[in-house]
């Protein structure tokens, strides 16, 4: 699941299959943790199905609406559901807390479906908490896929039923549409993806001076 290249195990990057890059950095504005998987060329139908399932999983969790008191262990199924529907699983949590200029993995907040004696899955999601949303599919000897954004918990409406909460995606990077099967997504999920890419385009275009880069971004964030 985590790969460190050695002379014995390194792989040549070729114009085919998928490439997963998990990256991040420390900035005065905060700590980033982001993963994107890219189609470097032709990919198989299975790889596209898995890529799209991971995308749907990420979007399902990012667009959750829930009452205050909900824990990460209760929300995890929203992400894991599309992948469980395929009869497979990723053997790790869906997300972890992120600190501010300290550890990129910091509790107590997380998303995972089962309890562990070394973790606190009973932590309630609170406004302002930053948690990663990173479902994946990992097929040994074949391919690995992960799409990761950071989410910040926000207050929504409060009424007689209680305080509703949701998430704001604060990661701003295109998702490779060349590996997506639109018909595998529900209309709602396609709308969520298009809304996210509109946000990415609106945020990043003003920061780009090069016409070629701006044209690339418009294409990378096109509606499907």
Label each residue range with its predicted role.
Residues 1-224:
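Active-site neighborhoods and metal-handling regions in enzymes and metal-associated proteins
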